[in-house]
Regions:
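Glycine/tyrosine- and acidic-biased, solvent-exposed loop/turn segments at the edges of beta-strands
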Residues: 1-131
Length: 131
């Protein structure tokens, strides 16, 4: 979720599809600008071409569901954001071997309900409840 200016080299707001490239020629990120603000789905990549993260923006703000990936392509985590860019909804993170690491729910940036933490073989290590 790199900080990419929404203004072009002439001081005008960017509009339409956008791609940024690494020195090796591979795509670093791709998405769309609407009047200088990130909009819709954006994808970010590592310099080997592997996807690093993907998710949505609305009026330049991070919103909706996002997914992050390990270098091996396995999911690193998933989670959502509300319209104020606060964590919201079910969040999950994974160990590098693909096993679930932790899971729980956010409500507008605050942990709520039962959160569970697992070791890398899937065994439940801890449960904690947030109000």
């Amino acid at each position: 979720m790199k900080d990419i200016p929404g203004i072009d080299e002439h001081g005008n707001p960017k509009n339409g599809p956008f791609e940024l490239y690494f020195k090796n020629g591979l795509v670093s990120c791709q998405g769309e600008f609407d009047n200088g603000k990130k909009s819709g789905e954006w994808k970010y990549f590592l310099n080997n071409g592997q996807m690093q993260s993907s998710g949505s923006y609305k009026d330049g703000k991070i919103v909706g569901q996002w997914t992050w990936f390990f270098k091996n392509g396995q999911p690193r985590g998933t989670g959502g954001f509300d319209d104020d860019e606060r964590k919201h909804g079910i969040w999950k993170r994974y160990h590098a071997n693909g096993q679930l690491w932790d899971e729980g729910r956010f409500e507008h940036g605050k942990k709520k309900g039962t959160w569970k933490v697992y070791n890398d073989d899937g065994t439940l290590l801890k449960e904690q409840t947030f109000k």
